[in-house]
Amino acid sequence: MQETFKHAEACWQCGTPAEEDLFCRYCNSLQPPALDYFRFFGLEPRLKLDPEDLQKRYYRLSRLLHPDRYTQKTAREREYSLEATAILNDAYRTLRDPIARAEYVLKREGFESVEPRSKNVDPELLEEVFELNMALEELRSGNEAARPQLEVARDKFLAMRSEIDRDLQDLFEEYDATGSREILERIRRLLDRRRYVQNLVAEVERELAN
């Protein structure tokens, strides 16, 4: 496994032609960290990743970049170690979660994030949301008879979210095979719908817990 970092024309320490590696191949100095999460882990930008492989890469990089290894190194290497460790943790949190990973790929490919809004949701779901809001108001006003209706609604939205996740997995595979921006647009719309449904689930669960 070859860890990759952002390309520089030459190693900052010895001046030899730089490769896209974690350490200079000639003087073994730590190089500036890559900002791209996939490149940081030495991975191709894909929507489906092997979680075990990603975890192994994370643990290995954690050992290589730990600041304790650089206490006797140059100030620049100590700085790079801290920067790289912060990027590593952010990258791992993002790439290990399929939804966060998809959102990262969309941003990486220039797709703007779309906030979940009612105008992006089909009329059938909006009707259910209207009924949900009525039940929420009933519960908030002290009418416990609305609780079973909310539990049914929560389960329905959870099932809806699971269905969206299955559809996303299919689209992830399709994108990895084709690299199609049309597929990315379909993924973006599904993620928009998922966020909307997830917000509904969170709102219902919050009220049921009160």
Language-model features: where?
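C-terminal accessory/regulatory regions appended to core domains
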Residues: 1-210
